[in-house]
Amino acid sequence: MPQVDPDLFDRGQFQAELALKASPIAAFKKAIRRAKDVLDDRFKSGRDIRRLIEDRAWFVDNILQKAWDQFEWSEDADIALLAVGGYGRGELHPYSDIDLLILLDSDDHEVFREPIERFLTLLWDIGLEVGQSVRSVNECAQEGRADLTVITNLMESRTIAGPEHLRQRMLEVTSTEHMWPSKEFFLAKHAEQKKRHHKYNDTEYNLEPNVKGSPGGLRDIQTILWVARRQYGTLNLHALAGEGFLLGSENALLASSQEFLWKVRYALHMLAGRSEDRLLFDYQVRIAGLLGYEDSDAKLAIERFMQKYYRVVMSIAELSDLIIQHFEEVILSDDSGTAQPINSRFQLHDGYIEATNPNVFKRTPFAMIEIFVLMAQHPEIKGVRADTIRLLREHRHLINDDFRNDIRNTSLFIELFKCETGIHRNLRRMNRYGILGLYLPEFGHIVGQMQHDLFHIYTVDAHTLNLIKHLRKLQYTEVSEKFPLASKIMARLPKPELIYLAGLYHDIGKGRGGDHSELGAIDAQAFGTRHHLPDWDTRLIVWLVSNHLVMSTTAQRKDLSDPQVIHDFAQFVGDEVHLDYLYVLTVADINATNPTLWNSWRASLLRQLYTETKRALRRGLENPVDREEQIRRTQTAALDILVRNGTDPDDVEQLWSALGDDYFLRHTAGDVAWHSDAILQQPADGGPLVLIKETTQREFEGGTQIFIYAPDQHDFFAVTVAAMDQLNLNIHDARIITSSSKFTLDTYIVLDNEGGSIGDNPERVQEIRNGLTEALRNPDDYPTIIKRRVPRQLKHFAFAPQVTIHNDAQRPVTVLELLAPDRPGLLARIGKIFLEFDLSLQNAKIATLGERVEDVFFITDANNHPLSDPQLCSQLQDAIVKQLSVNSEPGHDLRISI
């Protein structure tokens, strides 16, 4: 800390100002304001961050000493003011906690009660927010013994004012001789760390990470230092290196990583104007700018900054693992067990694998891959001993092109993917210890690569490893209940290692610009060649990487009731083996991208596409389903259900004659029977018919189906979606049919706000039925579009809406494709625009992916003809862009093909 820094705090000038004023408060406030401005300017000008946070602690020391001196403490008063916690370490960010301990010799606080209260009131009045406790030396011992947080705080203390001997007595009575011996302290701190990591989903890669508490954050470094302090009395990284726990290079890496996080935290506090340790979207862009990051052709400044952040915390996590493992071996192990040999290079020691000698990786570099294969083959191995982790770090520079092309290494790497257990766990270890990104440089490029959106909630490398984890979990019984089809298929894949390898490469092309699927396919081809895979295996992996998005896109954006869509997709996959691999990869990809994306409706779409495609392949691609044949089958099966329930077939025939082919193509026989039975029982003047099908019989069946039958009216869609918006329903699919008798038969698939179906909640079902019926009975009372606040996260991912309009070559409709930021009431707004432009909606596919929607609308003009006027299309596009823009930049993307 500085001894004198008059620019930050001029003691003489401050004392003079105190003497001139009747009240000291104004002088203190002025000094605090000035110091804040000086420190902020120093940060912006690039001042060394360590000096900066020490400067702030020094300034607060001076302010507290001056405040303490405002009161009459006798020279021999047994009372002292101590800094504890982070402030005790001499580290203060702009809004860090200023933790104080007022330490007394006697348990009787009464004699000092009044001056202490006046002192704390002064601190409050001058705007210094402190956390304080008042304890005697004995009380420190009592509370420290009972509370891990208290003993941790007391270990980091400095005397600000008053006699130093009180602090020394406090340290003596709270030492390891009296409480919290190093073993007990380490176990408690390690458990505390695990609990904290679990709170942040055990990942360094959260979208809005906590700079202090997330895995790899500042708290992990502090945990290392606390344990070292309890064991050795050292309280900084340099001293820890002196104890042999850190190499010089490791000490330098930890120190530079800590300083980077300090910069981020300082900037966070400065921008937020409060104590804020969450790296929120609100601040990420501005911090990237403050720290000097700029946009490039391939990456935004924020992506470059966040990649740096994730790589830093990953380095901290790696070193934390090493040091904690070292502590565990030194503090906990009795070292009584004998090592059990695994082979000439490795042995098992206390359940952990270790190299048999320090030269193993130097003499046999292939052992850097072998160690992970051995752990996968022996799942009882708990992990890697600290010295061996360090040896891996020291020798990983040997991984060069010769290493990558060595048949021993390529064979071992493929062997890992053939193991029955431990594939994901050991790939994560390889990534954590920096081996994976060196062995596969293309993987190294995606480490810490964040995509700046809400759709992808993990970095590319974390998502990739999560995907492999999901593939592996499909073999677990508890997971197979949620993913029955994917689990069944996974179990019968002829070569499961190929799906893992495809998963490893599916997103590896991201962050380079261009089509990541094509770039990844090129890398996958090179991987197959280098690893001497059979041609068929390589071709399958390359095909999967190149086309890993096709099944999801088809399921969510195409009409799966159209036989031509199924036939085209069946032709694309070619055979059941490719279909099986692609389905399993798609399911794992969606679940590994963002757990909230996987809902019952998306699951049912993929299942339907898989099942229908499999039927088409077994029937033979040369025998596609004829539209008339499908209609005939649906009608026959539906009529059989109705007749068995006592319905007059003549009534059915009369009803069906007005419905048209599309209705029977888009609905199952069961749905046709359900609709027909209700329609035929509906009184002529009964108003709108609203049917709601509950789906709780099968937990993962899909969304809730709402069927509406009523006389057609121009604003029917607009009124319906506005009413559903008011009912807090999320629409995922819409099928709009108008009969020749001018009745509309609309089917909506909806989910609740939690992504589930409505289920067997009679009150909720009745609320929906009543709300829709009332709105459709009184269409003139157009439901008001609810003006909900746009969620904070969505505001930071706003982009200009993109609208593509073209006519369908096979059907007499115009296709309007919308890519836009999500916002409350979006569909209701679209419906209002269609109403204003006198358009009829024939069909819709709705998909919400994170912060964006990807919707497809099939529309016609009022005469049921495709749109043909480019000017009208341009006006329509402008209206949509204007209505849906959310904090987006000016301009939009329009492609019209009429």
Swiss-Prot record:
UniProt-annotated stretches for the region Uridylyl-removing: 342-704
CDD domains reported in the protein's UniProt record: ACT_ACR-UUR-like_2 (cd04899), ACT_UUR-like_1 (cd04900), HDc (cd00077), NT_GlnE_GlnD_like (cd05401)
GO annotation terms (biological process): regulation of nitrogen utilization
Domain HD: 460-582
Cofactor(s) the protein requires to work: Mg(2+)
The reaction(s) this protein catalyses: [protein-PII]-L-tyrosine + UTP = [protein-PII]-uridylyl-L-tyrosine + diphosphate; [protein-PII]-uridylyl-L-tyrosine + H2O = [protein-PII]-L-tyrosine + UMP + H(+)
Classification via InterPro entries: ACT-like_dom_sf (IPR045865), ACT_dom (IPR002912), HD/PDEase_dom (IPR003607), HD_domain (IPR006674), NT_sf (IPR043519), PII_UdlTrfase/GS_AdlTrfase (IPR013546), Polymerase_NTP_transf_dom (IPR002934), UTase/UR (IPR010043)
Activity regulation, per record: Uridylyltransferase (UTase) activity is inhibited by glutamine, while glutamine activates uridylyl-removing (UR) activity.
PROSITE patterns in the cross-refs: ACT, HD
Pfam families found in the cross-reference section: ACT, GlnD_UR_UTase, HD, NTP_transf_2
Region (Uridylyltransferase): 1-341
Domains as described in the record: Has four distinct domains: an N-terminal nucleotidyltransferase (NT) domain responsible for UTase activity, a central HD domain that encodes UR activity, and two C-terminal ACT domains that seem to have a role in glutamine sensing.
Protein name: Bifunctional uridylyltransferase/uridylyl-removing enzyme
